[in-house]
């Protein structure tokens, strides 16, 4: 008995490990795993179904087919455990060893492992420094390779064809050694001296200067070093022994009818064994070389197919013409081992059903059909039945449950009480897609869901299904209750706004109840309180909308958090007074004293949560829902065809538009406008007409005229049902009402261009056939887009999760002083996002001072909550430096202070929170709401793009930044700098508006001057770019020779002549080297210097420039010397929506990126080549100039002799994020990506907190390239993990040595995921083969730091509740203790014993 218990204990021991290492397997290692050699290709005997001896399923090698029973049946039962039968050679043990015992095949000739050969870059090729083509020719017996040159003129590794080999044999005899096949490659690999080769390459690296050569050398050095360090031997990449997978992992199952279903691997192994045996026989017979060679090649191909079918040549197909699934196919792809079984497992104790509404449920409840509950909670019911003594055995209990006896239902009630279940709706796009509820038993077969959680699940009741899961263990139940309960998930983790918000009916009900109406029944009464209001309403003495005075008692929290009552008489309506009864104490009456729309209700819940906390909010939310449903039913709001009131003006608006279109058509026919202009104008006319119709319609719907108490007419907001639905935010929008009662407007063709004949009808009037046909385009495109969108959005989320999965909060404070400056987002005249929204929930990086003083307003390291933000607003602070994850100094993970507030909970984030996954989900989840298309700008939009002035909206003072300007003759400022910004500051010092001012703009007001709202402050010519002089004097032409560098043109209409500079391509040979320029001289003819420098004022003119001055004219500063016509870029496509977000996160270079200045200095142009010009920037301090070739067609923003700063734009275009990082730093690139991504989401009205995007950016910046190795052991130009450089530098500096210098790299999310330190995580993401090959060669260790790796190896993840377990293990490891072993109690042991004995009895009781 005792040793049985010991045996059981050994069975339950869990493996504790800290890291997983992957390496090449040596032949001896493969043999040590093996339990015997597989010699025959046979599988099982088709008559007896017993495995053949020495075959692929041999019981002697792999273990018994039945538990504790040998093959011939001599030994049965547990007592013979461990005996090896002398007759059949099978060990008596459990069958499950057939899942773990491996075999092997001794190959008669070595074969190359295809992964190390063909997975690019080829490892064997890199190691031998031979091209892959040559190696393949040797391996597949087409050429010879020289292994030892001896005293001959043949080089080692030289490739010889058959003829060359024979010639060499004749010439040198056996002086040299050349072979073909894998033996040759193996010999080459064996004879390599890795250390010496490494030394040699390092020396070469120091001597060489060519960039490509350096890259190649570093690659080889890295590979060789990896081999040296990992202890892998190169010749192990050639297989001499092939391992055989355990048979139960490649099963063979008999189907009825004498056929077998088998895993493809068996076929592949059979081919290998057959060819191997044939090759052995041929070698024993000493067959002719050519036959042996052919057989060897076939063996090589068979092994290739087994390891990775289809990688080389055609894939081997089975009987049914489809390629066989090889070992590589087993692990890669969506159906492979990683994604199908390790990352996505199926679970027991779950059910699914359709969902319906449960309007009477509380927020933490869900309705569970009795049938489902009975099935899901079976084990608990069996247990209870036995415990009560109502059933003696499990079998009896089972029978009772099947009969559904009365007592079973009582027990079910008991079991279910306080036992939460998880509800999940696919697709689970964010963590709120799985929440816990307490089940309430219901009749029927549909799960009932609380209406308020629909928003989080994105569920509706048109046939959606949901899955139920039962948390079994106590810990699981505890987590479900404490963390996943729907009542604990009130706020969205993406933006910190409430996600439990009413929608549709509830909103309509509350809106209806809080509206007021002129002269309603009971207007003007004075009531004692909400109770009386309700009584009057119920008894029909007062209308719900009557304006009355009511005595209201409000409660307000004082400084100590006590509630203080305050009673006053309020002007309000009956409905609002009734609603006040459900509002929790502590909120002001003003929040219900308004017509409540969806936004107002959301704000009300948010306020409630911030002031009163979780519990009152949950109760309040439920009450809101019940009240809303009640009054929505009372309102009787419905949609009738007469609610869609068509405006009378519609006909005349349309006929006016038609007349204008006809007029333009005439102009087009008489040749006054071009076809494109006509099209754009027509579309503009119809768009304007549509707007007018919809405005007339909305004015019509919005108000109605009523008679008030005094008998006068008064306008009030309409009670039209459709209008109320749209106005409250319950359903529908102005655009949809426009289609119902206005006109449908312009439609797009399938290719996205707009059809110029609009649909003038609306749905109430009905469409004719043509109109209906046109409108089908749009509908069809919508459906197609949605399908594409879902797939793309899902893939984006997967990439985001993958790149961010290992980012966890690991410490409280990293102590950094770095951070990013937060300012409000202002585009033109509107504040898109106020500062408050951007800094709320962040931690300050430095003290915030009161503007204009040195007094500290907010100290450093303060978490900015609502009250702090109010303080910032009161003092009109305009910029705050906050901590950010991008600048966090924690090595693995981030610190809580750099992250700030946990948006879903409202306090600073806890340690162990998986912020990476939360960020990825928050960005990915709204992905399906983004559009898929690229926007074409045409018509009205493209004309608006060419702005030519700035008109301010508000009054205030002007502030210019980065400005250089000169005053012109009329006393106005002319801008001569490139990236000038004009800001409007209000009287409190806050920025209200911000505009970009181009070069050459004329300002009406100067810096610091006051302007009134609506005033124009700057204007410029959008079509030409001027050349402005900064000094006054006389113009002197240099190199301006008519016919060579310039030509004179006269305008027919005005008769004015102007000079046009010829492009270098148009010039004659003599004019090629001339540089046309305008020089400014004083009256004496001496050069005038540019103020502040010693350079003469000389303006070089580029080709196509137009000069309207004559030689020797007097000019004054600020005048235009020449104009350069700007080719307007035509209609540019703007990539929007999802593709744009993907481009940003993948850090793709745009097609024609902006050219930025690499260094600061003076611009000049060097010698031109055919299609390019040479830009030279000479630094002022006299160091080496920087040169760059720029295509001629790029329009440059700089003139010769101008001074630029590093990172300035030289030629416009979309900026490449890599350039921003290189030239302007980490913070600039963070700001760029965050702002660009936010622009896309903001357009769709989706709110995402900046810090989620910053988290992804931090992961994109994980790598750094070593610039100078210092005394570290990195290679120059090597790409390493940023944290590793930091740690290494810290150690070096502590020892007083020189650290490595590096430059940060920006990787796209796919690249970053594949470049992670963890090979398990990378392999499960994409390109499994390549990742595993690389890892094996380098002998990588996976420290299992991220979440994905731990899920794959089946451990608790180092986040959330698993964080403590991992911390504990790390502490133990540091202290060197053994991990706490799981204790086996006596009960456990006896239970396991019973199970084991049952197994030994051959399972007589197998129901």
Swiss-Prot record:
It holds the Pfam family RNA_pol_Rpb1_5. Zn(2+) 2 binds at residues 814, 888, 895, 898. It comes from the Bacteria. It comes from Shigella dysenteriae serotype 1 (strain Sd197). This is DNA-directed RNA polymerase subunit beta'. GO terms for cellular component: DNA-directed RNA polymerase complex. The keyword Nucleotidyltransferase applies. The gene is rpoC. CDD domains: RNAP_beta'_C (cd02655), RNAP_beta'_N (cd01609). Its EC number is 2.7.7.6.
